[in-house]
Each structure stands twice: as structure tokens, then as C-alpha cells.
Amino acid sequence: MERFFENAMYASRWLLAPIYFGLSLGLLALCLKFFQEIFHVIPNIFSLAEADLILVLLSLIDMALVGGLLVMVMISGYENFVSQLDIDEDKEKLNWLGTMDSSSLKMKVAASIVAISSIHLLRVFMDATNIKPEYLMWYVIIHMTFVISAFAMGYLDKVTKH
């Protein structure tokens, strides 16, 4: 009976595979939104104010960071919790494949969230005249919460490894 439960629990890791595949569909949706934003800005490029162009570019950078985060979670999560990726030797491999454990994945995710939050905060500050001061305060508090959390996770990871 114990062996059955252990084998069933171990096999249940494959339930994560469609979730990671679903993230790739999310990446496709993000890609479509990215190009929608580009095609939206191109016809207006010469009439667009510099600040508005910077806001669009920050939005594109934000999407690129989220896309990278999705790829990182998808691939390393699959490798850590489902199965190793068997990529042909003649194919190009990402240099971090097979090297990112769940601890380093958490740190990369935390760093990505801080970067994404920073971009969002910069976009908010560029439009600060249209945002209530108490909202600005909360944006900064939330961002600092992400920064402190990422720092604390890194510190705890360092302390527990040594």
C-alpha cells in the first residue's frame, strides 16, 4: 500500500506539465500584446510626445521582462519538478539549463519581480501629475516590499547555505 501511494505521488508531478505548457500559451498571448503595442505606436510615432514614447517603451520593456520570467519559470520549473529536458546535442542550449535549482529559481523570480515593479513604478512617476499622492505612496510601499522581500530571501538563502 505504501509503495502504491509513493508511486502515485511521484507520478503526480506530471500534472504540472500542462501547467508549464499553459505558461507557454501565456507567453504567446504576451507576444501578441507586445506586437499590438508596437503596431499601435508606429502610425503615431511622429506625433507622439517624447514622454508618451518613453511610457510605451517602458511598457515594452515590462513585457519583455515578464516574458523572460515566464520562460525561466516554465523551463526550470519543468526541469526541477517534472522531468529533465532532453535537448539534442546539436541544438542551442541556454547556459543555465540544468543548473537552476528551486532556491536559485526563487531568487531569479524575486529579482525579476523587483525589476518589473521598478519599471512599473517609473511609468507611474512619469504620470505622477495624474495620480493621487496616496496612490503614489502605496506604489512605493508595495515596490519597497518587493525589494525588501527579495533582499531577505537572498540573505536567508546565503545564511542557510553556509
Swiss-Prot record:
Its main location: membrane. It comes from the Bacteria. The chain crosses the membrane at residues 15-35, 53-73, 109-129, 136-156. It is a multi-pass membrane protein. Keywords: Cell membrane, Membrane, Transmembrane, Transmembrane helix. GO terms for cellular component: plasma membrane. It is found in: Cell membrane. PANTHER family: UPF0114 PROTEIN YQHA (PTHR38596:SF1). NCBIfam families: HI0507 (TIGR00645). Belongs to the UPF0114 family. This is UPF0114 protein Psyr_4257.
